[in-house]
Amino acid sequence: DGFFEMNINEIAKLANVSRATVSRYFNDGYVSAEKREQIRKVIEETGYKPSAQAQMLRTKKTKQIGVIIPKINSESISGMVSGISKELKQAGFWLLLANTENQEREEVEYLKLFSENQVDGIILIGTIFTPAHKRALRALQVPVVVLGQKLEGYSCVYQDDYLAAKESARMMLKDAKHPACLGVTKRDHAAGEERFRG
């Protein structure tokens, strides 16, 4: 027995039903219990799986999520990407990774690219949000989640850098016998400014 790719016509023939009935079966339309069982049996016996392209055309879903990161050589970011990848895989999605090398313009370009290539959603681990970022985000037709920063109007997952720095300084000063120093930089727009304020 040679391997051959099944199609809807062959399933209909083997199940002794019409092509339209098989189509309704795959599109969750009405099919009698008897015919539904015949089709299910053929699918099970042949190991048929609809092609990803056919499913995408039917459902308008790609099962792909674009993930935009500022740099790949960061332990914290690689840890986030690993966790995102694991969760997406368990949910049946593919991860498309874009590394921007801390280039704000690249982040905006990837937002546009992912939008044009019909991903089902975007996860953005951004550095700073410029007016160009905000325009690109507003133009998106897919859900967006921002990680690491708070951006009004979007679903965000972030830590309170201001409070974390304030509490760290308070705890250090409480037990300090000598003047303490806590190093932060304002140059890190994503977290540094809030930590400096704290």
Where are these regions (language model features)?
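N-terminal helix-turn-helix DNA-binding module of bacterial transcription factors
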Residues: 1-63
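Bacterial carbohydrate/catabolite-sensing allosteric modules
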Residues: 1-6, 45, 86-91, 139-146, ...
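Short, surface-exposed alpha-helical segments at coil->helix boundaries
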Residues: 36, 78-82, 134, 166, ...
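N-terminal helix-turn-helix/winged-helix DNA-binding helices
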Residues: 44-82, 91, 101, 113-116
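Short beta->alpha junction loops
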Residues: 96-104
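Short beta-strand-centered segments that line the small-molecule binding cleft or hinge
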Residues: 108-125, 129-163
